[in-house]
């Protein structure tokens, strides 16, 4: 708070104002690598959020051996007590429900992708620290959900640790690497001459 003007907030000394001069952005810098990695993660979410529903609506819940809905074919057969191809033949309403369920997941993936791409492009590129940490935390926020899914499968005697590592491991690793590299790039950029952005 400003002593002369009660109720008026003053910008923090730690983080410059959004319109303050900043070092010029360079793609071939550490911050540029971080922005690129977060854009790739957003692009992957965007791609899957488009491709999965299209594939499921065109070819059904059992397309690609059911991997788009429940992972490895043997696993989903054990989890459901019957395979997705059997469900499509004997219970089309359940198959349609599973496709609709995947649609809801893909809707959230799309909104996350748009937000992640916008955050990387408009805020992280301008070296906003909050954007870096928000990008990391938003990627890590999915981990507890995948652990809960893994727990549910494990309760039914289905080993899915390897599948979960393949599913979420690369995105978590990329997000952590992007954050470390981006933080290093921001610290390094503090020594460069500032320009108006």
Regions found by a protein language model. Name each.
Residues 2, 8-197:
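Topology signature of small-to-medium multi-pass alpha-helical membrane proteins
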